[in-house]
Amino acid sequence: GIGVAQDAVRIEGHAIEVRVNAEDPRADFRPSPGRVTGWGPPEGEGVRVDSAMREGDPIPPFYDSMVAKLIVRGRDRSDAIERSLRAIRDFRIEGVRTTLPLAAFVVGHPDFRDNRVTTRWLEDAGLPRFLKE
């Protein structure tokens, strides 16, 4: 065991993680290799960015396309969603296409806000709606 009784565990807050990939969600998630010509990760309370990427770094076509993980914590789900949307919109990556526009669409969508998404939601409903915008 982990040495902690279940009744001693307290849930505090809510967190959302967004994996930022150098891919084009409008082109069947095709990789977007190139050079990062602008890099400005978001900041703020509850916002963390895990990445080794910097301005001028290359994104080769041969490896995993993930360039960053954005982790946002809020007081509750609603607060985490609002902070996540702000962080996604403030995240500046230039020179390559990324999945950030799709992340903003998903996190801001009423189905996500109301916790009505499933493992099939993006493929069946979310992506078709995103592509129409």
What are these regions (language model features)?
Residues 1-133:
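Catalytic cores of soluble metabolic enzymes centered on carboxylation/carboxyl-transfer
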